[in-house]
Amino acid sequence: MLKVESNWAQACDTCRSAACTVYCRADSAYLCSSCDAQVHAANRLASRHERVRVCQSCERAPAAFFCKADAASLCTTCDSEIHSANPLARRHQRVPILPISEYSYSSTATNHSCETTVTDPENRLVLGQEEEDEDEAEAASWLLPNSGKNSGNNNGFSIGDEFLNLVDYSSSDKQFTDQSNQYQLDCNVPQRSYGEDGVVPLQIEVSKGMYQEQQNFQLSINCGSWGALRSSNGSLSHMVNVSSMDLGVVPESTTSDATVSNPRSPKAVTDQPPYPPAQMLSPRDREARVLRYREKKKMRKFEKTIRYASRKAYAEKRPRIKGRFAKKKDVDEEANQAFSTMITFDTGYGIVPSF
């Protein structure tokens, strides 16, 4: 018996002695090559069962994608683990794996079915209808999600949303290149290298006669509008060269060319109102203005307005010490100190009593 563990391959559900190689969705069973040939060659209904390869990495789940870079069939879990490891692995191109054909493992069943089809015309018609039904069912199974019939027995393998983000930018670049090449073939445009600066490649070839007609028409338009453009703009800076227009050459314009060809200002600038020129004063007017300024300066009043007359009178009466307002207590102390000083000064001299 095959030892079935987390690190061993999935054993065949029929013989239990060999490693499985395919997974049958209809039977929800893992089968080896021999058991798959025996089971699905029994009848036509069994041969129409959809089988897919087993993942070559874990060998325990049905394969969902085929990596072209690694040349390996991987299940959804292994695919996400391997291709999310680094940016280089994310660029691998993967495609969904299609079911195995019903004639892959059973040559006997194939020969038998061919003999039956050739010998019996009724069976030939039935076989043709069955093949058409099988093709339609196979296309529907890959375009649409599975129905509720096999939704419970898919062992974590679902078809639908996992195929939405398969083709990464490597394949999209290839598709874009193919589409551009096809578009150029449809338009009959030769692929040439345009190395010259300022040349725009045309996408539609113009015949020689059509080109000559366009050139003549453009010449007539230019000759008729010469005077109008000369009178309005005063130059030929807005005229486009005929050869450059027809051949796809972008005319190059520089500041020096525009200055030489158009000496006057543009129309948009001419329409704007001009700024008033700065007024120049004569020496006499300037002297008169200075005198008026000095007279006004002399007439200015800087008198201090008195809002409260009572406050002004009280401020004048308040005692001051060294020019600052002082309290009554401070004034009394100062007066006593001055009186004591005067007494000390008087006692310094002797008093002569008179008789």
Curated annotation (Swiss-Prot):
Tissue expression summary: Highly expressed in leaves and at lower levels in stems, flowers and siliques. Not detected in roots.
Subcellular location: Nucleus
Pfam families, sorted: CCT (PF06203), zf-B_box (PF00643)
InterPro entries xrefs: CCT_domain, CONSTANS-like, CONSTANS-like_Bbox1, Znf_B-box
Polar residues composition-biased segments: 252-264
Molecular functions (GO terms): DNA binding; DNA-binding transcription factor activity; identical protein binding; zinc ion binding
Inducing factors: Expressed with a circadian rhythm showing a peak at dawn.
Location of the CCT domain: 286-328
Cellular component GO terms held in the UniProt record: nucleus
UniProt entry tagged with the keyword Magnesium: no
Ranges in coiled-coil conformation: none
Residues reported to bind Zn(2+) 2: C55, C58, C78, H83
GO biological process, one term: regulation of flower development
Superkingdom of origin: Eukaryota
Keyword Protein biosynthesis carried by entry: no
Binding sites annotated in the UniProt record for Zn(2+) 1: C12, C15, C35, H40
Residue spans, zinc finger B box-type: 12-54, 55-97
Keywords: DNA-binding, Metal-binding, Nucleus, Repeat, Transcription, Transcription regulation, Zinc, Zinc-finger
Biological role stated in the UniProt entry: Putative transcription factor that may be involved in the light input to the circadian clock but does not affect flowering time.
Family named by the database record: Belongs to the CONSTANS family.
Protein name: Zinc finger protein CONSTANS-LIKE 1
Organism the protein comes from: Arabidopsis thaliana
